[in-house]
């Protein structure tokens, strides 16, 4: 009884395997990660502020944001999102992160993981995401 069931299982697996191979052969699947190149080029700007007891420099902040994204989702998403601190005001500890439309959610998700700069605890709080740099600068008080 068990040997008959084993033979039936093997036949079914082979049948499904043959159908799958034929399906993929006919379809000639070309999987593209991003079909529209405009999506990659479309920028998103994340307006944020930093809560910390000490003043934080913009270069250190960008390094920590990039490391947190790499730790959370890996170097592939770091290359896709490519976050950069465009503007950072040290007096008010507000700034703007530039990324693209594909990776801005990954950057937002990684911001809570940026917890420490030079052994000083920090918290990066995103305020708003916008599509234009002009509006982002207006939100932090720059022209």
Curated annotation (Swiss-Prot):
Gene Ontology terms describing biological process: tRNA 5'-leader removal
Compartments (UniProt record): Cytoplasm
Top-level lineage group: Archaea
Alphabetically ordered keywords of this record: Cytoplasm, Endonuclease, Hydrolase, Nuclease, tRNA processing
Keyword tRNA processing: yes
GO molecular function, one term: ribonuclease P activity
Enzyme Commission number(s): 3.1.26.5
Main location: cytoplasm
Keyword Hydrolase: yes
Reaction(s) this enzyme catalyzes, per UniProt: Endonucleolytic cleavage of RNA, removing 5'-extranucleotides from tRNA precursor
GO CC, one annotated term: ribonuclease P complex
Subunit-structure text: Consists of a catalytic RNA component and at least 4-5 protein subunits.
The family this protein is said to belong to: Belongs to the eukaryotic/archaeal RNase P protein component 2 family.
Task of the protein: Part of ribonuclease P, a protein complex that generates mature tRNA molecules by cleaving their 5'-ends.
UniProt-recorded name of the protein: Ribonuclease P protein component 2
